Regions:
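Non-catalytic, topology-defining segments of multipass membrane proteins
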Residues: 1-178, 211, 223, 232-291
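Glycine/small-residue-rich hydrophobic helix-like segments
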Residues: 181-252
């Protein structure tokens, strides 16, 4: 009897875990496909229904997109120098490991600074949906939990397993952000930086790194060196002639999806760069960035 109950619980747990991982990957897709490349860097503009869906997904993560975008733009202005708390290079020895665990509280600190200043670029001003719905991030987290309860019931699980899948989703999402901001800025030899604790800069003195593994895990966000060199690029990386769709997707799933959306006329490449804060404003008024 006990063995049967154990097996049943394991099946329920496996279903809840799968739902949570799927939710985390959906969060990654909304983050890289809309909040990062579209909203923040203006690489393209998504069709309204797709953008609306992405906004709803991000709402469920408890994130205010204009705050995230402001923090991220400030990070680009201060990448791996004083004022950028997400840089492993500024964390001392074993900075990659330290930053992995410190990234989330450091982002929260930067976000609170942005919220306090309440200063946003012209293209990041809140609209009616933000004011009425999406700024209410606690409600978004609650709605996300309700969605998990419903998904578990549809999958044949009891509703209470929704709490487990909800936690799994948030853990996956946080893990993705932490690994991007740590290994993504681990310099010329990320693996050596993990093992020896010493981070070596790239030949040009920067610390951005391109990691195939991180890109696979985060749907394309692992190519941080290329991204910092080409922040407005739709695809994070070079696309050699003759490269097939699977190879492109393996390198940058989010960018490949964006390319397909453009071809399907569901996204429009940007022709105007976003209006952003100056480096002085980003550093002095917005505080430290960590995304």
């Amino acid at each position: 009897m006990r063995n049967r109950e154990t097996k049943n619980f394991k099946r329920k747990l496996a279903k809840a875990t799968a739902i949570g991982v799927a939710g985390g990957l959906t969060d990654f897709m909304a983050t890289t496909g809309w909040m990062h490349r579209s909203l923040t860097h203006k690489a393209y503009k998504l069709a309204p229904p797709i953008e609306g869906a992405a906004r709803a997904v991000i709402w469920g993560t408890g994130t205010r997109p204009r705050v995230w975008a402001t923090v991220h733009r400030a990070h680009h202005e201060n990448a791996d120098v004083a004022g950028d708390p997400h840089s492993p290079a500024l964390q001392g020895r074993y900075g990659v490991v330290k930053l992995f665990f410190k990234n989330t509280p450091l982002y929260s600190q930067a976000a609170r600074s942005v919220e306090k200043e309440d200063v946003f670029a012209p293209d990041l001003q809140p609209d009616e949906l933000d004011r009425k719905i999406f700024d209410k991030v606690q409600l978004g987290l609650a709605a996300s939990l309700v969605a998990h309860i419903s998904a578990n019931r549809v999958a044949g699980n009891p509703g209470y397993m929704g709490a487990i899948s909800w936690v799994v989703e948030k853990t996956v999402y946080i893990f993705g952000g932490n690994i991007v901001n740590s290994i993504g800025h681990a310099g010329a030899h990320p693996f050596n930086a993990l093992v020896t604790g010493e981070i070596s800069p790239q030949p040009d003195g920067t610390f951005g790194a391109d990691s195939k593994l991180v890109s696979l895990l985060t749907l394309g966000e692992g190519n941080q060196r290329y991204h910092h060199e080409h922040p407005g690029s739709l695809y994070f990386g070079e696309i050699p002639e003759g490269t097939g769709l699977p190879a492109r997707a393996a390198k940058d799933f989010g960018g490949t999806a964006a390319l397909l959306l453009v071809r399907m006329h569901l996204a429009e490449p940007a022709t105007v760069l976003p209006e952003t804060m100056s480096p002085e404003t980003a550093s002095a008024e917005l505080g430290m960035a960590s995304v």
